[in-house]
UniProtKB/Swiss-Prot annotation:
Inducers of expression: Expression is induced by copper deficiency and regulated by the CUF1 copper-dependent transcription factor. The CTR1 promoter harbors the Cu-responsive element (CuRE), which is critical for CUF1 binding and activation under copper-limiting conditions.
Protein's membrane topology: Multi-pass membrane protein
Keywords from the named record: Cell membrane, Glycoprotein, Membrane, Transmembrane, Transmembrane helix
Positions of glycan attachment: 18
Subunit structure: Interacts with the copper acquisition factor BIM1.
Predominant location category: membrane
Protein name in UniProt: CUF1-dependent copper transporter 1
Phenotypic consequence of gene deletion: Leads to a severe growth defect in copper deficiency conditions, but does not significantly affect melanin production, nor fungal virulence. However, when both CTR1 and CTR4 are disrupted, the colonization in the brain and subsequent virulence are significantly reduced.
Molecular functions per Gene Ontology: copper ion transmembrane transporter activity
Cell compartments where the protein resides: Cell membrane
Compositionally biased residues, Low complexity: 168-177
Sequence ranges of Polar residues compositional bias: 158-167
Role noted for this protein: High affinity copper transporter involved in Cu(+) import into the cell upon copper-limitating conditions. Functions with BIM1 and probably also FRE4 and FRE7, where FRE4 and FRE7 metalloreductases liberate the Cu(2+) bound to the BIM1 copper-binding site for subsequent import of Cu(+) into the cell by CTR1, via the reduction of BIM1-bound Cu(2+) to Cu(+) to reduce binding affinity for BIM1 but increase affinity for CTR1. The BIM1-CTR1 pathway for copper uptake plays a key role in colonization in the brain where copper amounts are low and thus in cryptococcal meningitis.
Length: 288
């Protein structure tokens, strides 16, 4: 009977039992005895534990930076651009349609200011604010902006395969070419049509076969499609960035599974500091 095999099995069982006994499955603050990802990474002194805590703190901050960087990349990828959108606190705002609008300087109000002054500062557009046209007899009547009805939207969707967005864009381009593009009445009509289309999409009158969350995220220039075409310069970096985020998430999860209080505190504080530093960048585009 071979006794060497029995001895080897006994040695393996004793090693596994010692390892299971050394792993504490409860919150503890003892120094030494906890493995960090690899068998050789076992801090056994106070200085080594402090170094590990600093490294985990920096890794947690980097994880929140990656989340903010992903939001900046998504903001550019939704516009069909390669790269990422740099954060800025002033200057023109660039929308998905390619237009840019400059922000007015902030207005400071006095606490004792009257309601009349506040109304003068913020005055929303109403149909009476549009341009006025004079009749032959000299009388003046306001021009009511054109808003397409729901039946017109349904007929345009069922009768024609081309999206109504293209027609509105062509009409706007023709108006600009003929010198009418600067007319505030024409701009108001285009804005009113876009708002009516957005409400119809949200109510499910257009693309009713898609979920509500998907209808809200549709690209107005590609209403007939749910997804954008595959691009190597956009989708390959997206996959690599997601893989890096997943790797860091699992590394931090393994750190938390050691139940070491000092390591967990380092990760939690690092995530909080990282969110404080980078959470405001691109937070309006994509959350986490």
């Amino acid at each position: 009977m071979d006794m060497s095999g029995m001895d080897g099995m006994d040695h393996m069982s004793s090693t596994s039992s010692n390892m299971s006994m050394s792993m504490k499955m409860y919150f503890h603050g003892t120094i030494g005895g906890d493995l960090l990802w690899f068998a050789s990474w076992m801090p056994s002194s106070a200085g080594a534990t402090v170094g590990v805590c600093i490294g985990l703190f920096i890794l947690a901050i980097f994880e929140r930076y990656l989340v903010a960087f992903r939001r900046a990349c998504d903001a550019a990828w939704r516009r069909g651009q390669v790269g990422y959108v740099r954060p800025c606190s002033n200057g023109p705002l660039v929308f998905s349609s390619g237009k840019s609008t400059s922000l007015p300087p902030p207005v400071l109000f006095n606490r004792r200011s009257s309601t009349k002054k506040e109304k003068d500062v913020y005055n929303p557009l109403t149909p009476s604010d549009y341009a006025l046209e004079s009749n032959q007899d000299g009388s003046v009547e306001p021009v009511t902006p054109y808003t397409p009805s729901i039946h017109a939207l349904r007929e345009s969707q069922e009768g024609s395969s081309a999206p109504s967005y293209a027609h509105s864009q062509q009409g706007q381009a023709q108006a600009q070419g003929s010198g009418v593009g600067c007319d505030p009445c024409a701009e108001g009509r285009v804005a009113e049509i876009e708002r009516c289309k957005e409400k119809a999409v949200e109510r499910g009158l257009v693309h009713s076969h898609l979920p509500k969350a998907v209808r809200r995220s549709l690209d107005p220039g590609r209403e007939g499609r749910w997804s954008r075409p595959f691009r190597l310069a956009v989708d390959v970096p997206r996959g690599l960035l997601q893989a890096l985020q997943t790797l860091i998430h699992y590394l931090l999860m393994l750190v938390v599974m050691t139940f070491n209080i000092w390591w967990m505190i380092s990760v939690v504080i690092g995530c909080g500091v990282g969110e404080m530093l980078f959470g405001r960048f691109g937070s309006s585009h994509v959350g986490h």
